[in-house]
């Protein structure tokens, strides 16, 4: 089996879904811009040597339908000989794209792959056209299809208080804002054209979803949004709605050495796990345990961790059961997370992996973990190693 390495990773800024900079920019354009951008940063790589493009996207309809990966590749002017497939594992789609591309390289079916994902939640909302089979109610609770209610359930089971959630959300915004002000996102963001409030074109070079004014006190005034009578999860402690795309250029270690490109990280372990759909947010725990076992490592070996923040009520139980609560400030979501940056579904897996790799470089870390929950009860995890 061949070693798989990441030679570059990049993302668009996260645009606000409601009236944000990308309100007139299509998902295919965000993707095509990123595909061109990551290849422009790596002139040693001949695009014609790319075997396949794996691109995550959840709502594969409207502008994101009919294989958005291929549409974007054609818009980007990439060689028509390159294949392209759109991958859907709900929230874990672009991390699944990474796993799919990595396995193709490991088995020798490819030398170079381009992976990533996109979601324009402003143009194609998460619940657009959703039609669950009526018979599902015989197998899972109806609320299992309502992500906010699964977060409520998970939080209650683990005794997560409203105050803990508000503190976690405020931390996310504060850290993301600090990372922006200190230029820590600069290397991972590809400036992208958008529209200002007055409709004029401009280049967005930062995430516009972050709310630096967020405080625990302000969050405490918000009403529960999913269970108004008895709940604790609010809009402020849920991942923001945003539009964005992410990309990673991966290849075999032998190919990277042949081309003389810098190896930024190596894939050390990968895993998927299922869990009860009613507490879908718990998926990162079993997925991480499997990935670490396959990598021959422990959670203590991880120097930096990106745990996708679907909800504060979901992230905190995962952090607790993974033994991370005491090392949050040293290791976990050091540049904030999806509560501040948003969670464009098909984009997020490669986005958190991109942020992780940049953090690993900044901290001269050896090992890193990226993991996330997935709707209807799954988790996905990837362990990375710096050379």
From Swiss-Prot:
Keyword presence, Acyltransferase: yes
Coiled-coil annotated residue ranges, if any: none
Keyword flag Acyltransferase: yes
Top class in the EC scheme: transferase
Pfam families: Thiolase_C, Thiolase_N
GO molecular function, one term: acetyl-CoA C-acyltransferase activity
Swiss-Prot/TrEMBL catalytic activity: an acyl-CoA + acetyl-CoA = a 3-oxoacyl-CoA + CoA
Localization terms from the record: Cytoplasm
One of the record's GO cellular component terms: cytoplasm
Quaternary assembly: Heterotetramer of two alpha chains (FadB) and two beta chains (FadA).
Protein name as it appears in the record: 3-ketoacyl-CoA thiolase
């Amino acid at each position: 089996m061949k070693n798989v390495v990441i030679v570059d990773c990049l993302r668009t800024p996260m645009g606000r879904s409601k009236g944000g900079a990308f309100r007139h920019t299509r998902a295919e354009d965000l993707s095509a811009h990123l595909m061109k951008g990551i290849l422009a940063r790596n002139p040693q790589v001949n695009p014609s040597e790319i075997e396949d493009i794996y691109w995550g996207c959840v709502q594969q309809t409207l502008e994101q339908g009919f294989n958005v990966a291929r549409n974007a590749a054609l818009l980007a002017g990439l060689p028509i000989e390159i294949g392209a497939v759109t991958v859907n594992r709900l929230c874990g789609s672009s991390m699944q794209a990474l796993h799919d591309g990595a396995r193709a390289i490991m088995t020798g079916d490819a030398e170079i792959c381009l992976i990533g994902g996109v979601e324009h939640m402003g143009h194609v909302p998460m619940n657009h056209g959703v039609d669950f089979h009526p018979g599902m109610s015989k197998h899972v609770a109806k609320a299992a299809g309502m992500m906010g209610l699964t977060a409520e359930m998970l939080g209650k089971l683990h005794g997560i208080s409203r105050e803990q959630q508000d503190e976690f959300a405020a931390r996310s915004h504060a850290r993301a804002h600090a990372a922006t002000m200190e230029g820590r996102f600069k290397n991972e963001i590809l400036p992208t054209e958008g529209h200002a409030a007055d409709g004029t074109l401009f280049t967005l070079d930062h995430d516009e979803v972050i709310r630096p004014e967020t405080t625990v006190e302000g969050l405490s005034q918000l009403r529960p949004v999913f269970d108004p009578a008895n709940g604790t999860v609010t809009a402020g402690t849920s991942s923001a709605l945003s539009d964005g795309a992410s990309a990673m250029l991966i290849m075999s270690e032998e190919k990277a050495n042949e081309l003389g490109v810098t190896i930024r990280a190596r894939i050390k372990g990968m895993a998927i796990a299922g869990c009860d759909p009613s507490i879908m947010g718990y998926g990162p725990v079993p997925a991480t345990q499997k990935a670490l076992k396959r990598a021959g490592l422990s959670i203590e070996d991880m120097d930096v961790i990106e745990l996708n923040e679907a909800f504060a009520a979901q992230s905190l139980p995962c952090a607790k059961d993974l033994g991370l609560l005491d090392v949050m400030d040293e290791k976990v979501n050091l540049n904030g997370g999806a509560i501040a940056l948003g969670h464009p579904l098909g984009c997020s897996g490669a986005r958190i992996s991109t942020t992780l790799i940049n953090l690993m470089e900044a901290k001269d870390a050896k090992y890193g973990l990226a993991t996330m929950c997935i709707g209807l009860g799954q988790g996905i995890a990837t362990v990375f190693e710096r050379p």
